[in-house]
């Protein structure tokens, strides 16, 4: 586990069983001025997030916000898909099934372009799917997910014990979705509608095809502009 | 002037590695991350990790292929690992060879796998030599001008 650059605003937890890939993702994230913590397995990630037991932490019960408090404050999780033991998909399910962690955006990385896998991850709550090797341009896409969460954050901060699905919060998320949509951001926040997921899928698949000769200086502007624009 | 000559040598080596397809734009990205991040040892660290890892994996595969009954799934898992590491450092040629190798694993062909292993090994040794020369040149350049990198 390595912690670097504690000054920066967003803290990303990177999960990968390959040391080379951990080095790479850490470097990419550091270069994009994120605070980074890396771990080599899904179970270590959950441990770090304060979710220890194997049992279901009863996400259905609204009063379960206290038992699994977060050990460290993580703004986003980026995980490899293919890992021994707990896969990235398993980790995603655990995070999304936890009342205290479910709002943390999860991004999945994989070296294999398997459409069924990509869809499954996106439909089950992953924000994004990156094909490996991950590029600097991919890091820019993370910002939009982090900023979206920021918009929702004040409510959570004001009332941390609030049950996750109170009507007013749902309304607020809906408003945020509408706001995000009008602001031309990557509209969908928590629910992966078909159009949203296929758009992201397309973006992910595009990565293998696109390869501009001057990537060194201008990394893949095409994929960032294809439906993933953030700035307004 | 000696430092400039070494730099020319390094540039020539790197461009030949690209033109031969040994490395791809992912490797360029590592260099860019190193230069922009102000972390001089990054490429060296990742390349060294890759070489150690690849060497270990190739030996594991060789051992598996010597068994009387070959566990092709296990071989495939190792080749997949090697392919991933190669992709991450931009070792394009090794990566492509791994992709062909996986086909032989799926066909459960020992002869095919042994042939692919020989090719992967050859490609990897070739790349490792170049990487080693690259790192040596970088060290020599830095010795001339420690403030440069």
Swiss-Prot record, chain A:
Q: Where is the composition biased (Polar residues)?
A: 209-232
The induction field says: By cytokinin in roots, shoots and leaves.
Query: Which positions carry 4-aspartylphosphate?
Result: 80
What InterPro entries does this protein's entry cite?
A: ARR-like (IPR045279), CheY-like_superfamily (IPR011006), Sig_transdc_resp-reg_receiver (IPR001789)
- Could you say which protein family the record assigns here? Belongs to the ARR family. Type-A subfamily.
Q: What does this protein do?
A: Functions as a response regulator involved in His-to-Asp phosphorelay signal transduction system. Phosphorylation of the Asp residue in the receiver domain activates the ability of the protein to promote the transcription of target genes. Type-A response regulators seem to act as negative regulators of the cytokinin signaling.
- Record protein name field: Two-component response regulator ORR4
Source organism per entry reads: Oryza sativa subsp. japonica (Rice)
Q: Per UniProt, what is the name of the gene that codes for the protein in this document?
A: RR4
Curated annotation (Swiss-Prot), chain B:
Protein name per its UniProtKB record: Histidine-containing phosphotransfer protein 2
Q: Which domain of life is it from?
A: Eukaryota
Q: Which residues carry this modification: Phosphohistidine?
A: 80
Q: Where is the HPt domain?
A: 39-144
The disulfide bridges present are: none
Q: What is the lineage of its organism?
A: Eukaryota, Viridiplantae, Streptophyta, Embryophyta, Tracheophyta
Q: Which PANTHER family match?
A: HISTIDINE-CONTAINING PHOSPHOTRANSFER PROTEIN 2, PHOSPHORELAY INTERMEDIATE PROTEIN YPD1
Q: Name one GO molecular function term.
A: histidine phosphotransfer kinase activity
Q: Domains: what does the record tell us? A: Histidine-containing phosphotransfer domain (HPt) contains an active histidine that mediates the phosphotransfer.
Instruction: Fill in the misc note.
Output: Plant silencing simultaneously OHP1 and OHP2 exhibit phenotypes for a deficiency in cytokinin signaling, including dwarfism with reduced internode lengths, enhanced lateral root growth, early leaf senescence, and reduced tiller numbers and fertility.
Alphabetically ordered keywords of this record = Cytokinin signaling pathway, Cytoplasm, Nucleus, Phosphoprotein, Sensory transduction, Two-component regulatory system
Native source species: Oryza sativa subsp. japonica
């Amino acid at each position: 586990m390595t912690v670097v650059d504690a000054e920066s605003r967003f803290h990303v937890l990177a999960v990968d069983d390959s040391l080379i890939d951990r080095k790479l993702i850490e470097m990419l994230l550091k270069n994009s001025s994120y605070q980074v913590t890396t771990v080599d397995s899904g179970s270590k990630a959950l441990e770090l997030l304060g979710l220890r037991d194997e049992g279901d932490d009863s996400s259905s019960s609204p009063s379960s916000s206290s038992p699994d408090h977060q050990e460290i404050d993580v703004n986003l999780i980026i995980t490899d898909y293919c890992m021994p033991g707990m896969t990235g998909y398993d980790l995603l399910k655990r995070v999304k099934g936890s009342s205290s962690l479910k709002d943390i955006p999860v991004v999945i990385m994989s070296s294999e372009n398997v459409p069924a896998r990509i869809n499954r991850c996106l439909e089950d709550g992953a924000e994004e799917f990156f094909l490996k090797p991950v590029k600097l341009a991919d890091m820019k896409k993370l910002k939009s997910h982090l900023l979206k969460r920021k918009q929702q954050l004040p409510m959570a901060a004001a009332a941390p014990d609030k049950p996750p699905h109170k009507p007013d919060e749902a309304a607020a998320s809906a408003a945020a979705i509408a706001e995000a949509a009008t602001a031309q951001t990557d509209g969908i926040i928590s629910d992966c509608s078909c159009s949203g997921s296929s758009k992201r899928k397309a973006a992910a698949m595009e990565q293998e095809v696109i390869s501009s000769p001057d990537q060194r200086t201008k990394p893949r502007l095409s994929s960032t502009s294809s439906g993933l624009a953030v700035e307004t | 002037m000696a430092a400039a000559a070494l730099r020319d040598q390094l540039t020539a080596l790197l461009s030949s590695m690209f033109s031969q397809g040994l490395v791809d734009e992912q490797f360029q990205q590592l260099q860019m991350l190193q230069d922009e991040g102000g972390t001089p040892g990054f490429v060296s660290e990742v390349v060294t990790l890759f070489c150690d890892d690849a060497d270990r994996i190739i030996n594991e595969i060789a051992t598996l292929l010597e068994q009387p009954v070959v566990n092709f799934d296990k071989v495939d898992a190792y080749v997949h690992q090697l392919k991933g590491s190669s992709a991450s450092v931009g070792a394009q040629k090794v990566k492509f060879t791994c992709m062909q190798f996986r086909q032989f694993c799926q066909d459960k062909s020992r002869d095919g796998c042994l042939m692919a292993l020989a090719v992967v090994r050859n490609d990897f040794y070739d790349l490792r030599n170049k990487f080693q020369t690259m790192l040596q040149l970088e060290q020599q350049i830095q010795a001339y001008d420690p403030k440069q990198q």
